[in-house]
From Swiss-Prot:
Molecular function via GO: mRNA binding; translation initiation factor activity
CDD domains found in the cross-reference section: YciH_like
Organism: Methanococcoides burtonii (strain DSM 6242 / NBRC 107633 / OCM 468 / ACE-M)
Swiss-Prot/TrEMBL GO biological process terms: formation of translation preinitiation complex; regulation of translation; translation reinitiation
Gene3D superfamilies xrefs: SUI1-like domain
SUPFAM superfamilies: eIF1-like
UniProt xrefs under InterPro entries: DENR/SUI1_TIF, SUI1, SUI1_arc, SUI1_arc_bac, SUI1_dom_sf
Origin organism lineage: Archaea, Methanobacteriati, Methanobacteriota, Stenosarchaea group, Methanomicrobia
Listed name of the protein: Protein translation factor SUI1 homolog
Keyword annotations of the record: Protein biosynthesis, Translation regulation
Record-stated family: Belongs to the SUI1 family.
Length: 102
């Protein structure tokens, strides 16, 4: 077997469920901030950067909302106000709806 083992759960990397378990345990906060010149930015924070690939999540959210964005610390910032659709997209991505606070 040439498969690598997950250092957290000990399962082969193809069967690793660490990221799915981590998604259900995150307490996520979604809010909209106003920046310079009245621009709105949707900030999604509360992720554990060690357990979830924030750059992959950022890329997914930017493509879903057709906007620009970035990762700052343990938060994902998206250009524009996406508060109304964010919870549904995060639930579809595998996050627990009870843990997402608007």
């Amino acid at each position: 077997m040439s498969s690598e083992m997950c250092p957290v759960c000990g399962l082969p990397s193809e069967l690793c469920i660490c990221e799915e378990v981590a998604k259900e345990q995150q307490r996520i906060t979604v809010k909209v901030n106003r920046r310079r010149y009245g621009k709105e930015v949707t900030v999604v924070e509360g992720f554990d950067a060690n357990e979830i690939d924030l750059h992959e999540l950022s890329t997914y959210l930017k493509s879903k909302f057709a906007c620009g964005g970035t990762v700052k610390g343990s938060a994902v910032e998206l250009q524009g106000n996406h508060l109304s659709r964010m919870k549904a997209v995060l639930v579809k991505k595998g996050f627990s709806p009870e843990q997402i606070k608007d």
